[in-house]
C-alpha cells in the first residue's frame, strides 16, 4: 500500500501551510485550525517551514484561493524550500491540479494528510485494508480526466449518436 504522502524517505518533507479565513470564521478559528494542521503534519513526519492565510468572501472555484495569492504563497514556499503545500480545507481534484501547477509542488489537503497518518499507523492487515479503501475512495473523484489520452471513444461536436464504437480492428 502506497501512502498519499511518502514520508519513508530519509529526507523529511518540508511543508508550507495554507489557510483560508472565510467571512463566517474568525481569525482565531483559522489560527487554531492551522496550528492543528501543523501538529498533524509533524505527526506525519513533515517539517513545517511556513504558512499563509487568505481572507475570502467565498472560495474560488479554480484554485480555492485567488490566483494572485496563490502566486504570492508559491514564492514564499519556494523561498522556504517547501516541497509540499498543505491546505487546511478540502480541495477538489481540479483545484489541487491547478494549485500544483502554480506552486510547482505537491498539494495536499487536510483529509489526505489524516489518511496518510492512518496509513502510517495501521498495523493489522484489516486496518491496512480499511485505510487503503478510504484512500481509494478519497482519490477516486480526483482522478477525473487523468487518462483521457487513452480514450478511444468520444463523440464529435454535433453528432447525434454520441460516442461511437471502437472498430474491431482496434480491439
List each language-model region with its residue ranges.
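N-terminal accessory targeting/assembly segments
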Residues: 1-110, 114-116
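Alpha-helical initiation/capping and key positions within long helical/coiled-coil segments
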Residues: 29, 72, 128, 132-135
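Glycine-rich, flexible loop/turn motifs
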Residues: 60-61, 114, 125, 146, ...
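Short alpha-helix plus adjacent loop in nuclease-associated cores
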Residues: 112-131
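Alpha-helical coiled-coil heptad-repeat register
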Residues: 130-133, 137-140, 144-147
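Internal, active-site/partner-interface "lid" segment
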Residues: 146-166
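Conserved small/polar residues in nucleotide/adenosyl-binding loops
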Residues: 169-171
